[in-house]
Structures are given as structure tokens and as C-alpha cells.
Amino acid sequence: MPSFQHISFTAHYTAYVWYQMGISHPIFATRQGYYLAKLLRPIDYILEQSQYSSIRQGLLHRHQIIDLELEKLIAQYPKLQVLEIACGLSPRGWAFRKKYPDLCYRELDLAEMAALKQQLLDEIEINPPAVLNTDIFSNEMASVFAQFDSSQPLVIISEGLLNYLTSELMQQLWQNLNRQSSTFQLHYLADLYPYPAQHQRKSVLLAASWLLKQLSKSGFALSMENLQMLQQLAASTGFEKLEILLPSQYLNSPYKDLVWVLHAKRQPSSR
């Protein structure tokens, strides 16, 4: 199992930014997140002086687009099921279960983060479903998917995960998710920060990427230079269709895009 304990570092930062921007519950805003947001604020200030999206705006845009895509899927499939992997301190599970009481929405993360998330959910939700703790790269995922009804569509969400993975690990993850969920009609929602080859503030973004990598002792990187590379990777791992959703088009954002949102789809192989 690859070691991704460092991911919880940025989970605190992201959760605090979401709280600041009014789209999260205060309970997910930690002291650690406050200090991280303060540390990265100067970089965001520089980005906000240009026509390009800042880190904060990127976090907001990706969350909004994933939420809107999920709303569309729920409207299309009333018995839709949701599995959010690497859920971190995202408020999405809590918010959607509150809005849709009958929605089957499960969350999954590494052991330490899963325990923290469970503790926080227990304070704001009545009998929240258990936060799962499973190696997403292993055959153990079969036991996770066994908890869902394969006769109904399933959407897997991973927000803030892919930039911690090399293209090889991303391929392994997508192959495993497709293999273990082969009997489901599958949708997959995720985000990805591409390499800023044409970004006016490229040096600032690369500096921010380096800082996150050093502070979290992780492999965080801005990856995938073009859409064709991503389309090929998705096709090679079992997805039949991949849509790339851009904030400038989807949300009519006046800023040039910093983040992509992915919506991949696949029909079941058998029932």
C-alpha cells in the first residue's frame, strides 16, 4: 500500500478554506488548517492580482462543480449510491445526507483521518454511517463495494487526491476501482491540477506546489500537461467516457482555469 498519510496535511488546509468561503461546517475547520491557510495566503494574494484563478478559488470551483454534477446524478438516478474515497474533512457527505436523508453516501479514508472524521460526524449527525478505512489500491476494495447494491448506479468521488499520485499510481487506482466495481454502472468524479505550461503565474504556482510538497513531505505535483494524456489514461483503465469540466465554462468563472474536474463513466460488465 502506498503511504499517503501526508494527504491529511492538506486536508486541514482545504477544509479551513472551505469554511472561510462559507461552504463547510465550522467543526471541520481545525487549528492546523488555520495556520496553513495563513501560511499560503501570500501566494494566493499574488495569484489574485492576475486574471488567473487563485488556490482558494480553485478549491471552491472544484468543490462546486463536483457538488453540481452529483446533484444532476441524484436527479437522474433517485437510488444513486455514493462512495467518497480520500474524503478528508470534506463537508460533502454530511451536507448531502442532510439534504437527501435516504441517500446512501459512504466515506472512506486512511485510518487516522477516518477516525477523526468519524469523531466529528458523530458530533453533528445522528447515527452517521461508519467512515470506512480500506486500502484503495488493494483487493480489499471488493468488501467495500459489497456494501452497495450493484443493481443501482454508483458514483465514486475523489477530491484532492490525484495530484499526490504519479501517473503510474493513478493508473493503478483507476484500474482497481474499475475492476472491483465491474458489476456497477459507474460514475467517477475527481479533480486534477494540470501542469501550468501556459500560466502567466507559472513560477508562483510551481513555488506553491513545491511548498506543499516540502511541508507535507509528499509527492504533490502539478501533472498532466494536456487533455489527450488524460483521455488515454482513462480509456486504458476501463472508463468508457471522460468529460473534462472547466470552471470558466461550467461556472462562467471570469478567471482562467487552474483546476479541471473529471467525470468518467462506465457501464457494468455483467449483472
Model-found features: residue ranges?
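Rossmann-like AdoMet
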Residues: 1-83, 89-134
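Short amphipathic alpha-helix with an adjacent loop that forms part of the alpha/beta core around
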Residues: 140-150
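A short, conserved alpha-helix within the catalytic core of class I
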Residues: 141, 164-177, 181
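Conserved beta-strand signature within the Rossmann-like core of class I S-adenosyl-L-methionine
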Residues: 155, 181-196
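A short beta-strand submotif of the Rossmann-like class I SAM-dependent methyltransferase core
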Residues: 155-158, 170
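Short, glycine-/aromatic-enriched active-site segment of Class I SAM-dependent methyltransferases
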Residues: 203-220
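Short alpha-helix
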Residues: 220-242
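Core SAM-dependent methyltransferase catalytic element
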Residues: 248-271
